[in-house]
C-alpha cells in the first residue's frame, strides 16, 4: 500500500519502511508524527480523501548540501560569494 502525503507544501509518495528527508519540523528526535494522507493507493483501487493517518518517526535533524551563490558585476571588481545549507529532518514511515 502506498500513500501520497503533503508536508510543508511538498508531496511525497510513501510506503511503510521508507526513509525520506523533509524540511525541518518542530519535533524532537524519536517523536512519532501523524500525517493525514491525500491519496491512498492499493494494488486494485485508489482512494481520495482516505480515513486514517500515516505515522512517521523522526530519526534526526541535519543540514542539506551546501548551495553556493556567486554574484559578480563585470568591470567593477565586485564579487560576492555566499553559501547556504537548508535544515532538514530525516523521517521513517512506520505505518499507514
Curated annotation (Swiss-Prot):
GO MF annotations in UniProt: rRNA binding; structural constituent of ribosome
Keyword Mitochondrion found: no
InterPro entries: bL21-like (IPR028909), bL21-like_sf (IPR036164), Ribosomal_bL21 (IPR001787), Ribosomal_bL21_CS (IPR018258)
One GO cellular component, as annotated: ribonucleoprotein complex
GO biological process, one term: translation
Keyword terms of this UniProt record: Ribonucleoprotein, Ribosomal protein, RNA-binding, rRNA-binding
Matching PROSITE patterns: RIBOSOMAL_L21 (PS01169)
Keyword Ion transport (UniProt): no
Entry similarity comment: Belongs to the bacterial ribosomal protein bL21 family.
Protein task: This protein binds to 23S rRNA in the presence of protein L20.
Subunit (UniProt): Part of the 50S ribosomal subunit. Contacts protein L20.
Protein name: Large ribosomal subunit protein bL21
Gene name of the encoded protein: rplU
Amino acid at each position: 500500500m502506498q500513500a501520497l502525503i503533503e508536508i510543508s507544501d511538498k508531496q511525497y509518495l510513501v510506503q511503510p519502511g521508507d526513509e525520506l528527508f523533509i524540511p525541518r519540523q518542530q519535533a524532537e528526535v524519536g517523536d512519532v508524527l501523524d500525517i493525514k494522507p491525500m491519496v491512498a493507493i492499493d494494488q486494485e483501487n485508489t482512494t481520495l480523501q482516505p480515513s486514517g493517518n500515516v505515522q512517521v518517526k523522526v530519526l534526526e535533524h541535519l543540514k542539506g548540501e551546501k548551495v553556493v551563490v556567486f554574484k559578480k558585476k563585470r568591470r567593477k571588481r565586485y564579487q560576492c560569494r555566499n553559501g547556504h545549507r537548508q535544515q532538514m529532518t530525516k523521517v521513517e514511515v512506520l505505518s499507514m
